[in-house]
Amino acid sequence: MSLPTLIILYGPDGVGKSTQIDILAKQLTADGHTVKKVWLRGPHTMAFLLSRILIKAGRTRHLSNPFGRVKTLPDIGTNPLIKQLWALTEFVSVLPLLVIRVILPLKLGYHVLADRYVLDVVVSTAFYINDPNFIRHKISNILMGFIPTSSVLIHLDADYDTLIKRRGNLVEPESFIDFQKNGYALLSQRVPTHYIDTSKLTVDETSEAIQGILRNCKG
C-alpha cells in the first residue's frame, strides 16, 4: 500500500498539530513527495461575517480561561431555524475551500497534510450554535463525506493542565476544550482514527508515533 494522499491531524489548540504538520511536510518532501499543507476549522467567510454582525449588535456569549482571558462568541440563540441557517451558511462557505484546497490538489497528485479538517468544522459549528446534536446532523454527514476512505486521521490530544503549560494565557476556555473532546469522541466512532496523547511526549516522540502509524498504513 502506498502512502496515504490525505493525512489529517486534528485536536485542540496546543497539542502540537502545526508543529507535526511542518515536520511531516519536510520529511515527505525530502522523500520526493509533492506536499500541500491546508488548515480548516471555522467559521468561514459568510459565517464569519455573520458572527461579526451579531457581536457588533451585542448578541454575544462569553467564556473565559483560567487567566481571565475572555472569548467572545456570537449568541445564536435557541431558535432551531436560526441554528439551521448558521450551519447552512458555514457549509456553503467551507464547500469551495474544500474543493480548492483539498479535492483539487488530491486530483493533481499532491499529498495533502491537513492541520484540522472537516471534523473540526463540524465540532466548531456545533459549538457556535451551542448544539452537540449537530454532530449527527445531515450537514455534518455531508461534510464527513469529504474524507476519502484512504485517508489517515490522527487525533492529537493532551490534558488541560498540559495545554495551559503550552499555551499560557492563550489557552482556550476549558468548557470549549471539553466540548471539542466530546465532539471528537463522537466523530471518531464514525471514521477510523488513530489517537496520540501528547501530554507526556516530546515533539520528537510524537513525530515518531505519527511515523509509526503511517508505516503501518503503508503496509
Question: Predicted segments — roles?
Answer:
Residues 161-219:
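NTP-dependent small-molecule kinase module
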Residues 31-47:
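Short beta-strand-centered segment that lines the nucleotide-binding/catalytic pocket of NTP-utilizing
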Residues 12:
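P-loop (Walker A) phosphate-binding loop of NTP-binding proteins
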Residues 111, 116-186:
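A glycine- and Lys/Arg-enriched "phosphate-lid" helix/loop adjacent to the NTP-binding pocket
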Residues 20:
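Hydrophobic positions on the alpha1 helix immediately C-terminal to the Walker A/P-loop
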Residues 9:
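Hydrophobic anchor at the beta1->P-loop junction of P-loop NTPases
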Residues 42-130, 134:
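ATP-dependent small-molecule kinase phosphotransfer cores
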Residues 17:
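Conserved lysine of the Walker
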